[in-house]
Amino acid sequence: MGPVESVKAYTTQAVHKYIETEDLGVAIVRFKNGALGVIEGSTALYPGLYDRIEIHGENGSVLIENSQIVRWEFKDQEPIDEEIRKNRGLETFELGSSRDPMEIPYELHRREIEDIINCLREGKTPPIDGYEARKAVEIIIAIYRASKTGEEIRLPLTV
């Protein structure tokens, strides 16, 4: 999709009034190429749902649920597409539900940290380095600013 241009967001304490932070957040992300995206996160859902990523465009759609590819369809098929559909492309993990944040396991985070440590030991660059990670953090900060101010927040952020 490319770089993010701006973010508009809303957060609330929909269900868990006893916690110190929001339990529902929705953001609309505008990319520099004009595409729009939606990011939603919640621990206020019943009965508690697993992670879900949807990517849709004029030439195809991908749907990932619980870290497994459920749909992989493109207008123009490539040889690798059938292989991805057959193997589902991703290892499946039991990820717990969004209803109880304590059920969300740490396995994927642990693997990511181990990979970074191994790259440092071997003098390699991690697949996602600190510069790329900062971009994700910048988007998260923009989402919080947008939800707090009610304004559309443009990126890159200024101090």
What are these regions (language model features)?
Residues G2, N118-E122, K148:
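Residues at helix-coil transition
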Residues V26, F31, E54, E58-Y131, ...:
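C-terminal glycine/acidic-rich active-site capping loop/insertion
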